[in-house]
Structure formats: structure tokens, C-alpha cells
A protein has these predicted regions:
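Bacterial N-terminal signal peptides that target proteins for export
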Residues: 2-13
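Bacterial N-terminal signal peptides
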Residues: 11-22
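Extracytoplasmic metal-acquisition and chelation regions
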Residues: 2, 25-284
Length: 284
């Protein structure tokens, strides 16, 4: 009997040691020389890479070509978060809100950074506009939140991150000034877009965004007729359509109002270039 008890104790201690070892391994991976940071969308990856260079591996939760407003992370992705140093979210996306509970339940130690915490929120026809990253000023504010969070959890990199933040802020300020000058000369201050993803961009530069998609749904014939009339009255010359949508969705209305169709990618991993291309299209 004593031998059996001794064996049970030994096995139990072995299991405990294994659990502690696994936890220690996960912790070691999180604090490795090149730890992993997870972000919700590619534009946030761009910001992290501009700030941190190769200091972190950056994994993007939403696959390319998929809408982050409807995407649901897989169980494997959520499990992968156990090895991440931090999870950086936009803070406004549907899947972030629906899966946040699951994330905190399954990975309670995960440090989360709400990148849009200081971005003034914007309302649209469907409610809160989730596209908080779509302007240089928004990216600047997001970068500040990201550095604040990373410096808190990864203190030995704090000084370097603060230096790169200053450089990024200067870059975004310069881009903002460039776009402001450029868009002052835009003949038309109103544009049409299939999915209303440029509300923050429009707010910053005094533009007006009209959307084909209505309340997150395909538009009715009556709504389209009203939209065509408004576009004509306001002299709309550009119709944007996001990369993940078929341009044919806007081709008929563009033809009817005599506007050009321009494909954009608000989820690009180079949002700076996207802002430049959007301004260029509006000024041609």
C-alpha cells in the first residue's frame, strides 16, 4: 500500500511539473528574443512594423480578402494567442467584440491593446463606424496606444519604441499636410463608395461619403434611385469599391452618373500608399 501511495504521489508531482514546465515554455516563447504580436488586421501590422521593425513577429488575425466585420477567428487562431506577447485590436470590429469573451476565457494572461482607444468615434447610417484606421491622424493616435501598451509589457524596448514613435508621428503629420493641400484642390467634395469604409478619411479632409451599401445590406431600387439623384446633384465623379467586392456592383451606377470606378484596399498592409491613391483619385 505504501508503494502504491508513493507511486501515486510521484505521478501527481510529475504531472504538476509538466504543467508548470508547459506554462513556463509558453511564457518563454512570449518573451523570446523575437516575440510574437497578434493584430486584428493588416493596417495594424503596418503600424507595428513601422514602430518595431524586426523586434516582433507580427501575425494578422483576419486573412487577406476577408471582411473583418464578419470574420470569425478559428479555434486554432485563438489557441495560438497563448504564445503571443500581446493582441492589438482595432477595438471597433465585429469579430473583436464577439470573440473577446472567448479570447479572455481561453487566454486570460493575454495582454490586449485597444489601438483606437483615443480615436474620436464616428457614427454612420448603420451606427458606429468601425473603420477607425482610415486616416493618417487615426494611425498616429493608434501608434501612440500601441507603443504605450508594448512599452508597458516589454519595458526593455520602451526607449526604442518611443524614438520610432516620434519618427512615425512626423511621417503621419507630413502625410496629413500633403493630403490636406492636395484635397483642397478637389473639384468635388463628395464621393460614392460601395461599402462605407472611408468615413474617418472624409471627416479629416472635409469630404462627404455616400455609400451604395445601405445599413449593411444591398440597396433597394428606391434607395438607388435616390442615390443617383443625389450623386448628380453633388457632381460625384469617383466611385470607390473595395478590393474584396466585385467592381460590377458599382459599374451600372457609375455609368449612369458619368463617374469613374476606382478599386481601393482599406485593408492593405500599406495604408499610407492607399491614402495617397485615394486622394489622387479624388483630385483627377
Amino acid at each position: 500500500m505504501l508503494k502504491i501511495k508513493t507511486h501515486i504521489v510521484a505521478v501527481t508531482m510529475g504531472v504538476v511539473a509538466l504543467v508548470l514546465l508547459c506554462g513556463s515554455c509558453a511564457s518563454d516563447r512570449r518573451m523570446a528574443a523575437e516575440p510574437t504580436v497578434c493584430v486584428s488586421i493588416a493596417p495594424l501590422k503596418y503600424v507595428v512594423k513601422q514602430l518595431a521593425g524586426d523586434m516582433y513577429e507580427v501575425e494578422t488575425m483576419t486573412p487577406a480578402g476577408v471582411s473583418p466585420e464578419t470574420y470569425q477567428p478559428t479555434p486554432a487562431q485563438i489557441a495560438q494567442l497563448d504564445e503571443c506577447l500581446a493582441y492589438i485590436r482595432v477595438g471597433t470590429l465585429g469579430f473583436e467584440n464577439t470573440t473577446l469573451r472567448r479570447i479572455t476565457e481561453n487566454v486570460p494572461h493575454l495582454y490586449q491593446i485597444n489601438a483606437s482607444a483615443t480615436v474620436p468615434p464616428l457614427k454612420d447610417a448603420a451606427g458606429d463606424d468601425p473603420h477607425a484606421w482610415t486616416s493618417p491622424t487615426s494611425l498616429k493616435l493608434m501608434a501612440q496606444e500601441i507603443v504605450r501598451g508594448l512599452a508597458h509589457i516589454d519595458k526593455h524596448k520602451a526607449d526604442t519604441l518611443k524614438v520610432t514613435l516620434e519618427a512615425f508621428e512626423t511621417e503621419m503629420d507630413s502625410l496629413d499636410a500633403q493630403l490636406s493641400r492636395q484635397l483642397e484642390g478637389a473639384a468635388c467634395r463628395t464621393f460614392l463608395i460601395y461599402h462605407p469604409a472611408l468615413g474617418y478619411f472624409a471627416r479629416v479632409y472635409g469630404l462627404k461619403q455616400l455609400a451604395v451599401e445601405h445599413d449593411g445590406k444591398k440597396p433597394s431600387a428606391a434607395y438607388l434611385a435616390k442615390l443617383v439623384k443625389q450623386c448628380r446633384e453633388e457632381g460625384v465623379k469617383v466611385v470607390f469599391v473595395e478590393k474584396e467586392y466585385d467592381p460590377e456592383l458599382v459599374a451600372p451606377i457609375a455609368k449612369e452618373i458619368g463617374a469613374k470606378v476606382v478599386v481601393i484596399d482599406p485593408l492593405s498592409d500599406n495604408p499610407k500608399q492607399q491614402f495617397i491613391e485615394i486622394a489622387k483619385a479624388l483630385c483627377q
